C-alpha cells in the first residue's frame, strides 16, 4: 500500500496534489486524458490500482483547476514505482508535467524510485539522481491471424493464480503478489498460463484498452512459451472484437522484440526505465530474459 511522507523541499510552481479514489468523476477525467498522453492504461486499471494504493492516484491542481495526474505505487517501503505525469490536454507545455513530477518525488524522501520516463524527461529525472536501466518499447498493430493452439496454454484458475508470485517477483524488484493476482482476475480480462509438468512456466494477461487491447504482463521461461501465450491472448482479443493490440517490452530482451515483429506489430512509442536508488540500496534487478511484456508503463 502506498504511504506518502511529508514533502521535503517544495518543487517549482504551485502544483498541489490530492488523492483520487476509484470510480470517481476525477478517475474518468484522468482516463480521458491518458489516451493521447503516453499512458498505457487499460479499462479498469485505475479502479484496481486505487484498491491496492488508496492514496496513490494523484491529481495536480493549479489555482483550483485540475491540470495533471500521476500514480505512485509504494511496495513494502522498499521501492516506489511512479508514472510519468500526464497533463490535461487543455494546457500546453512541459512545465506542468515537470512540476507535478517534482511534487510527487518530494513525498518519497529517500526511498528507491523507478519510473518509465518519456525521453523528453530523461534530463529531469537524471538531475534528481535517476539513472537509465533500459529502454522500453511499445509495439502495436492489428490483431494477428489465429495460429495453432498450444495445449499447454490454459486459463488461469485459482491454483495457477497462486503460482504467479514466482514469475512476477522475478520480473519486478519486489513482491506485489496480491496486486498481480487481482490484475489477472479483474472482470473483462483474459489471463492464460503455460503449464509444464504441473508447473506454471509462463503467463500473460490481455485487457481492453482505450483503443488497442493491451497485453501485459507477459512472462515466460522460454521464447516458444511466450509465443504460445501471446498467440492465445491475441486470438481471444480478436474473438471479443479487438482490432489492434499493444504490448510494452524491454528492449534488452531480443526475443520479446522478435515475437512482436513476427506477429506483425511495429515500434510505436518508447520510454526509459529509470531508477533512483534509496538509502536501502540492494533492490533486486528484474530478470529480463523472462520479461516479454510489462504489466503497464504506469506499474512496471
Please report, for each region that a protein language model flagged, where it lies by residue:
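A short helix-loop-beta-strand connector motif used in the catalytic cores of GNAT acetyltransferases and
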Residues: 47-68, 81, 135, 183-193
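Ligand-binding pocket scaffold of soluble enzyme catalytic domains
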Residues: 22, 32-37, 50, 57-58, ...
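Conserved acetyl-CoA-binding loop-helix of GNAT-fold acetyltransferases
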Residues: 87, 93-106, 223-236
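Amide-forming acyltransferase catalytic core, primarily the GNAT-like/NAT-type
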Residues: 28-32, 130-214
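Conserved N-terminal entry element of GNAT/NAT acetyltransferase domains
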Residues: 1-24, 142-158
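Flexible loop/N-cap segments at domain edges
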Residues: 201-207, 213-249, 262
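Active-site/acyl-donor-binding loops of N-acyltransferases
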Residues: 2-4, 116-117, 128-147, 243-300
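Conserved beta-strand in the GNAT
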Residues: 59-74, 80-86, 199-208, 212-214
Amino acid at each position: 500500500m502506498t504511504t506518502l511522507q511529508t514533502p521535503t523541499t517544495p518543487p517549482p510552481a504551485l502544483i498541489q496534489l490530492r488523492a483520487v479514489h476509484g470510480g470517481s468523476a476525477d478517475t474518468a477525467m484522468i482516463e480521458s486524458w491518458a489516451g493521447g498522453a503516453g499512458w498505457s492504461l487499460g479499462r479498469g486499471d485505475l479502479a484496481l490500482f486505487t484498491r491496492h494504493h488508496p492514496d496513490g492516484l494523484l491529481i495536480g491542481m493549479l489555482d483550483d483547476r485540475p491540470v495533471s495526474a500521476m500514480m505512485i505505487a509504494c511496495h513494502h517501503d522498499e521501492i516506489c514505482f511512479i508514472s510519468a505525469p500526464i497533463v490535461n490536454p487543455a494546457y500546453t507545455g512541459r512545465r506542468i508535467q515537470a512540476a507535478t513530477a517534482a511534487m510527487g518525488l518530494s513525498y518519497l524522501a529517500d526511498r528507491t524510485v523507478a519510473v518509465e520516463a518519456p525521453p523528453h524527461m530523461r534530463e529531469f529525472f537524471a538531475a534528481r539522481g535517476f539513472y537509465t536501466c533500459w529502454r522500453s518499447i511499445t509495439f502495436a498493430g492489428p490483431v494477428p491471424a489465429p495460429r495453432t493452439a498450444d495445449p499447454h496454454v490454459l486459463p488461469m484458475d485459482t491454483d495457477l493464480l497462486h503460482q504467479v508470485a514466482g514469475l512476477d517477483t522475478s520480473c519486478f524488484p519486489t513482491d506485489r503478489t496480491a496486486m498481480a493476482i487481482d490484475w489477472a482476475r479483474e472482470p473483462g480480462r483474459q489471463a492464460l498460463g503455460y503449464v509444464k509438468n504441473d508447473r506454471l512456466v509462463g503467463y500473460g494477461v490481455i485487457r481492453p484498452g482505450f483503443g488497442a487491447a493491451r497485453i501485459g504482463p507477459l512472462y515466460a521461461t522460454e521464447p516458444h512459451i511466450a509465443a504460445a501465450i501471446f498467440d492465445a491472448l491475441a486470438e481471444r482479443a480478436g474473438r471479443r472484437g479487438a482490432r489492434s493490440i499493444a504490448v510494452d517490452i524491454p528492449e534488452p530482451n531480443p526475443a520479446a522484440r522478435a515475437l512482436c515483429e513476427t506477429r506483425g506489430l511495429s515500434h510505436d512509442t518508447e520510454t526509459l526505465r529509470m531508477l533512483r536508488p534509496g538509502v536501502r540500496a540492494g533492490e533486486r534487478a528484474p530478470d529480463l530474459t523472462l520479461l516479454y511484456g510489462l504489466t503497464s508503463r504506469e506499474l512496471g
